[in-house]
From Swiss-Prot:
UniProt enzyme class: isomerase
Pfam families with a match to the protein in the record: Asp_Glu_race
InterPro entries: Asp/Glu/hydantoin_racemase, Asp/Glu_race, Asp/Glu_racemase_AS_1, Asp/Glu_racemase_AS_2, Glu_race
Taxonomic lineage: Bacteria, Pseudomonadati, Aquificota, Aquificia, Aquificales
Name under which the protein is recorded: Glutamate racemase
Length: 254
C-alpha cells in the first residue's frame, strides 16, 4: 500500500515517522511545501489552493490514501479534498481531539496552533462538542523556530513562556495543533510541568489502523518544493538518519 503525506514544510515528517513506526511495510511518498511555508498566515482560499495542488501531486504518484499532515490544511481544506480527490483523505484534527478528550481528567484542554488553525475554530468546536472547556492560543513563532532547528535553548524557552504563560494552572491537557510543534515538545513540557501533551501525529497514526494494509516494500520518497540549506539537518533530526530528497516539480502556484 502506498501512502501520500503532505505538509507545509518539514513538520509533517513527525507524522511520517509515527506512521512508519507503526506500519513498517507501507510505501510512503512525502511532499513538504517548503517553498510556501508557513500556511498558517495565509488566507482560506490560498490554503485550499495549495492543499489541492499538493494532493494532486501525490495522487499523480499513485498513492492509495492521502494524509494531510498539516493542521491548517486539515482545518480549511479537508472537506474540499475529500470531494475533489478520488482517494481517501485523512486529517490530523479529529484524532488529536479524541485523544485529548480521552486523556484529560478535568476537561480543561489547551490548543496551540498557527493563527489560521486557531482562527478556524476547528479544534475548539470539536472539543466543546465533547464537553471540554477550551483555551486556544496561536503561536506563530513556533514554526520558524522548528524550521530553523532551534528546538531548545534560551530563545526557544522565552518564546514558549511568552505564548504559554496564560495556560499554567488552567489546563491539564495540551494539544499540539501543528505538526511542527512536537519538535518543541521538550521545552513545552518543561515549562508547563504536569500537563498531558497530545501529539496529533501519534493519534493520527493510531487512527489509521482500519485503513492501512501493511503490505508494501517499505519504500520512502521525500519531495520538497524548495531544497532549503537546512533541510537535510531537519530530516536527520526528525527521522534519525539522512535520506535522499527530490525537488517536487508540478503546478505549484504562488
Amino acid at each position: 500500500m502506498k501512502i501520500g503525506i503532505f505538509d507545509s514544510g518539514v513538520g509533517g515528517l513527525t507524522v511520517l515517522k509515527a506512521i512508519r513506526n507503526r506500519y513498517r511495510k507501507v510505501d510512503i511518498v512525502y511532499l513538504g511545501d517548503t517553498a510556501r511555508v508557513p500556511y498558517g498566515i495565509r488566507s482560506k482560499d490560498t490554503i485550499i489552493r495549495y492543499s489541492l495542488e499538493c494532493a494532486g501531486f501525490l495522487k499523480d504518484k499513485g498513492v492509495d490514501i492521502i494524509v494531510v499532515a498539516c493542521n491548517t490544511a486539515s482545518a480549511y481544506a479537508l472537506e474540499r479534498l475529500k470531494k475533489e480527490i478520488n482517494v481517501p483523505v485523512f486529517g490530523v484534527i479529529e484524532p488529536g481531539v479524541k485523544e485529548a478528550l480521552k486523556k484529560s481528567r478535568n476537561k480543561k484542554i489547551g490548543v496551540i496552533g498557527t493563527p489560521a488553525t486557531v482562527k478556524s475554530g476547528a479544534y475548539q468546536r470539536k472539543l466543546e462538542e465533547g464537553g471540554a472547556d477550551v483555551f486556544a492560543k496561536a503561536c506563530p513563532l513556533f514554526v520558524p523556530l522548528a524550521e530553523e532547528g532551534l528546538l531548545e535553548g534560551e530563545i526557544t524557552r522565552k518564546v514558549v513562556e511568552h505564548y504559554l504563560k496564560e495556560f499554567k494552572g488552567k489546563i491539564d491537557t495540551l494539544i499540539l495543533g501543528c505538526t511542527h510543534y512536537p519538535l518543541l515538545k521538550k521545552e513545552i513540557k518543561k515549562f508547563l510541568g504536569d500537563v498531558e501533551v497530545v501529539d496529533s501525529s501519534e493519534a493520527l497514526s493510531l487512527s489509521l489502523h482500519n485503513f492501512i494494509k501493511d503490505d508494501g516494500s517499505s519504500s520512502l520518497e521525500l519531495f520538497f518544493t524548495d531544497l532549503s540549506p537546512n533541510l537535510q539537518f531537519l530530516i536527520k533530526l526528525i527521522l534519525g538518519r539522512d535520506y535522499p530528497v527530490k525537488l517536487a516539480e508540478g503546478v505549484f502556484t504562488h
